[in-house]
């Protein structure tokens, strides 16, 4: 060890998982051919580090975590050999597995070494067998028995092996017989090394107190003469030793406290001492070159020692292979005019498959006819295949043409769009209700005389017109007061399960009480359920969407690993998927609940079946008891014939439920006493039943399915008693008798709902529905059941007989929910009085950016109360563009609308001394890819939503959402413009009584047009907002006089310069403040009784200027060929006068952040002349004269909207009676 040796680098041992803490290294070794240091941990992971800087190179899972730590490394030309307690693993240095060997008798491997043959190794341990493994073949070639239990092996002239008793056996390299044996230490040998003719050992001995201590001597042995040599004293305690690879008599000895000693075995008085900066040393390793030393400590670190100027692991090492750095593709100037051929295609030398000639296309045999699912339950095995009775659905010799697509698909026809109904039936009575009732109560198809029950179970699908989802008539599918859930969202197959959970009163109470706390965890599924349940309550039959909840669900890595997400369901049945999601939901909400209430057992009492599980070995009778709590019970069906169910009590639902809860099974498992796998019996003993009993039907075959086909098999009520640690279940007459006799301890459950899979053959695509008894969660007490079908956004009442009938092959139960009967009507709304509003009075930021000076957080004395007005405005960015299908005739159909993400929320005070001052101005961080920031309308720029670069106050979506949710439930009244669109994108439901939308305040019943906020600001206040450009005008005047001519005229030249700056987009604070001012002004008009006159004037001026503010400056106005006014409607002061037009302005006309199309100047001017009062047209005629500049404007002119939160008021929809203020 030279004088400049010191610690060169230090690296932490990689943790076993991405969210786990680092662990100590169990073994360390230098590669003998490359500049790599290999490290093994306690969980079977092997990692490598490159060079003196210890850069991470590879990391692989070589052994199972159950096998414990990695014990030792050996190096071969093919790769790295690692050893664990039960296996030997060879992987290339790049991490690819070459072979993995395990054996039943490999129970406690500890060490290995190369033999006399370089391609064979011997492995041994605390076991009676040693194995010879051929590295080239990757197989065990020999097995040797031994009476010694070895812990360490080192190869030199002989094979030196340390035993667990402190002895060292010198083994022959040919037959592995014991040549010599020494008792090196009193207890165990902790470390040893052998090189050339010397063997050095370090170990422990037992002293008088009975505990082992480190020996202060390192024993030395001569392998040539097989005699011991004088030991080397080491007063700090010799714990680790390594021989120098190039100096034959030099060794490194170290203590557990980090003291290093370099000593010459032939001259022990010549020593070199160093102290390593470690708390507790666990290992020592020397590189093959002798220039580097690796120290492993108890603080999960690896320390590399050496000379900084010339440290190398190997004298002549091979070059380490690294992954290729991919060449970045060249940047293309991509635009709408860029031809596709600039992208290019790969070089090819053969003809492409796409060039297949048409004359080589032939028709082959027809596809086989699909099996009729009606005969599947009746199949019987035979010698070859299976057989069943012919159902005789076809005539003799009649076959099915499988090439033709089935045109008899049973489906509920989509209703007409609201715009079509308003356009086609302007004066007729609304018939949409009659159409919906007829469809949902059973339409007659193909002349059938009976009602077709499949219609309401059909797949429902949202259709989109050019006006988006607002034009779809959801009320056609739902005439009830219970809201459905939309389907155009990823993982919406869980809608049926969410509806079932919502109508369980005790689960609903848990979710709402949890969300009213200060929980701000972004991935809290229980909070999202609370938000959804509250939204469904407030919707009162209007369609809702579970966007935020399903987005949170999609973000769980565990859900993706379990294959629970929609993209993983291609080869998985919906029935098994929803049952897995059911288990995941309940386990996750239990975890979320405990994060807020770690010491509360309310959720466990509600959902968890408390039980203990006893595991008994059938051989030695050793028994282990562990907790066996479960949130979901999987039904286990008996092997009895369902046909004998009426005579066999074991086939009753109550007995199947009892055996499923108190299940007793036999399986093979590990017995710690026998130390091997044995047959074990597992029995569960129930200690407490939950208030809500959640079941999975677990139908795996046709025999299970036949139990459900028995009429009346599923009971509406069940009774459960626990007597002497045994559970008893009752149903029917048995339950009724025990209820009448008031049996002590009897708990009665009633069925809340069922999730079922609907698989109608003609539809070719299964889906899920839920049946719910809504009377259980009704606020008004009632004993009569009221069953409803929830088929996504189709909601209708159904009879109890239809719910409990499962003898149809297309309906299969998946999940059931029973609730204790005393919890009926148990809706607890006390959470509304216990809202934790701390978030409203606290500055929350992800990037430590305080709110701007414009924003002032609410003070405690400003706590909102019911009726407090607040003004709201939001901005959004595009996460996905709309999917448009272009048909063969050129028509376009929207398949899926664009997907927006909330980017900014601004809320300002609507009353008080600080009226108009914002108290919320949050930018929301978005993890999803953003396809368009729509800066010209949103004001959001790239980088504004990135915590690393944003200059704004960034919060998580849940924080921004919860602030609005708190304000909603405090009773605040939201003032804004176009709030319906904002609320839909935010995914929040606000009652009409808490909404004031200036879009509907300034609505003329006979004009059929909604005015933009920008135009209203100009029409009411003559102010300009939402301007795309900032214009600066400068004027210079030059006067010239000829002095040679008396009384000469003076000429004056005026130069005007106009400078424009790029668009900055909308400011949500400015828009919210303007909406608040418009509401205040409207109240003044109401008090004065001049609302109608003002609206007439606003619309009259709007016709003149095209419902857009006129140009602010003269040079911005476009000459109108039909207008002879030399100033073109612009006064000398630069402010527009009524009647001026700007037909080619690109500013929005109406709607929220809606871009307009550019109209030709002639067309717009002609429209203004034709439609204006000068043209002699009526008000309707003037409206038709103004050409719509967007599809949404065209729709607004064809039909009127009511103030019902932005939805259409029926098929007629042509009148609007009054403002929402009245």
Swiss-Prot record:
Listed transmembrane segments: none
GO terms for cellular component: P-body; PAN complex
One GO MF term: nucleic acid binding
Enzyme class: hydrolase
EC number of this enzyme: 3.1.13.4
Keyword Plastid attributed: no
Localization per Swiss-Prot or TrEMBL: Cytoplasm
Keyword field contains Cell cycle: no
InterPro entries, A to Z: Exonuclease_RNaseT/DNA_pol3 (IPR013520), PAN2 (IPR030843), PAN2-PAN3_catalytic_subunit (IPR050785), PAN2_N (IPR048841), PAN2_UCH_dom (IPR028881), Papain-like_cys_pep_sf (IPR038765), RNaseH-like_sf (IPR012337), RNaseH_sf (IPR036397)
Residues annotated as binding a divalent metal cation: 873, 875, 982, 1071
Disulfide cross-links: none
Low complexity bias spans: 1050-1061, 1119-1133, 1180-1191
Domain annotation USP: ranges: 452-821
Biased composition (Gly residues): 1207-1216
Cofactor binding mode and count: Binds 2 metal cations per subunit in the catalytic exonuclease domain.
Cited Pfam families: PAN2_N, RNase_T, UCH_1
Keywords, in A-Z order: Cytoplasm, Exonuclease, Hydrolase, Metal-binding, mRNA processing, Nuclease, Repeat, WD repeat
Recorded domain comment: Contains a pseudo-UCH domain. This ubiquitin C-terminal hydrolase (UCH)-like or ubiquitin specific protease (USP)-like domain is predicted to be catalytically inactive because it lacks the active site catalytic triad characteristic of thiol proteases, with residues at the equivalent structural positions that are incompatible with catalysis, and it cannot bind ubiquitin. It functions as a structural scaffold for intra- and intermolecular interactions in the complex.
Family according to the record: Belongs to the peptidase C19 family. PAN2 subfamily.
Subunit composition and interactions: Forms a heterotrimer with an asymmetric homodimer of the regulatory subunit PAN3 to form the poly(A)-nuclease (PAN) deadenylation complex.
Function according to Swiss-Prot or TrEMBL: Catalytic subunit of the poly(A)-nuclease (PAN) deadenylation complex, one of two cytoplasmic mRNA deadenylases involved in mRNA turnover. PAN specifically shortens poly(A) tails of RNA and the activity is stimulated by poly(A)-binding protein PAB1. PAN deadenylation is followed by rapid degradation of the shortened mRNA tails by the CCR4-NOT complex. Deadenylated mRNAs are then degraded by two alternative mechanisms, namely exosome-mediated 3'-5' exonucleolytic degradation, or deadenylation-dependent mRNA decaping and subsequent 5'-3' exonucleolytic degradation by XRN1.
The protein's name in its UniProt record: PAN2-PAN3 deadenylation complex catalytic subunit PAN2
Lineage of producing organism: Eukaryota, Fungi, Dikarya, Ascomycota, Pezizomycotina
Gene, per the UniProt record: PAN2
